Amino acid sequence: MKETLGEMPESNGRRQQGCRLVKKEFVVPFVLVTSLFFVWGFARAILDVLNKHFQMSMDITMTRSAMIQATTYIGYFLMAIPAGVFITRRGYRPGVVLGLLLFGIGSLMFIPGEWLGSFDFFLVSLFVIGCGLVVLETAANPYITELGDPSTAPSRLNLAQSFNGLGCILAPVIVGGILFSNPEASVALPYTVMGVAVLGVAVVFCFVKLPEINSREQIVASAATDAPRGGAGAALRRLVTNKGFMAGVGALFCYEIAEISINTFFINYATDGGWLTPVSYTHLTL
């Protein structure tokens, strides 16, 4: 009995320490990386506002405006694996900086896009933004889990992702209010502001002291240790033949189709039916 009671303070101490969400030395990195979750949530939510705006300002069909979402997510599809390879070789910080640079450049490309009045040029800009966003997500999600005790990693990730939701809420209200309240409003304006802000954040990430949780050598060594015999080809075959994994991929694929389709075209359903104006629709996110 005495032995048990004697162990309790030590056990409780470990439990209290393990329950700390973020280590003290990682608070600043956690705040900076969490801000990225807000950034890409904001950027993705703007797409639904852009869809309706371009239909009105450029007199394009719903089918053609759907290329806004398609082009952005093609960037996700094509850049996902290269992003993982880059981060494995270079580390999390270079991955974040690369993602922010692509995002910022794509946003600033809206300026010449508006001068040219070319919808296709806007699509190229959105493709670059999509490439940047997937690099950001690939770097930030695993990095945020490493900034503290492993037992609290899910809580850290959930907290960071809540700011992603906040970005999704605010983007339609802010950008939709700008674009729909004034027919002559510049679509380049919000993207210019966002591009400058994102490039500023990239500069901060270049100079602020951030812990590189896993060095390049550690990541490569871990990947080599965990990889099955036969290399990448064997790993891919192992995944494809895993029924649970493929079922998960299929479920995510169907979920994304449903989510993106509803978010993209519900504004048309609500406004064309006369129930809401484009401006009042943006307030639904609140």
Stretch-by-stretch model annotation:
Residues K2-S35:
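Cytosolic juxtamembrane N-terminal segment immediately preceding the first transmembrane helix
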Residues L47-D48, N242-Y281:
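Extracytoplasmic gate region of multi-pass secondary transporters
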Residues A70-G84:
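Central cavity-lining transmembrane alpha-helices of secondary-active solute carriers
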